[in-house]
Swiss-Prot record:
Top-level taxon in the UniProt lineage: Viruses
Chief location: host cell
Alphabetical UniProt keywords: Host endoplasmic reticulum, Host membrane, Membrane, Signal-anchor, Transmembrane, Transmembrane helix, Transport, Viral movement protein
Function per UniProt: Required for cell-to-cell movement of virions in the host plant together with p7a.
GO BP, sorted A to Z: transport of virus in host, cell to cell
Protein name stated in the entry: p7b
Organism: Maize chlorotic mottle virus (isolate United States/Kansas/1987) (MCMV)
Length: 64
């Protein structure tokens, strides 16, 4: 995430907005691909995968 060109002179709300759009688009892509994968797997396996994914993302964001 550090390689994203966000200038430190930009206002805080603008940086938050850009980061929010990036994170939400990444999550959207992840859930879209997970949905297509879920068709071929059992729902229980899919739900376990989803919770692990979101836990990893939350831990990563909390460590900033």
């Amino acid at each position: 995430m550090e390689c994203v060109c966000v200038d430190s002179s930009w206002p805080q709300w603008l940086r938050n907005l850009i980061l929010g759009i990036l994170i939400s688009s990444i999550l959207f892509i992840l859930t879209k691909t997970q949905d297509t994968v879920a068709v071929y797997h059992e729902p229980s396996v899919y739900s376990i995968d989803q919770t692990q994914k979101f836990q990893k993302i939350d831990i990563h964001n909390g460590g900033k």
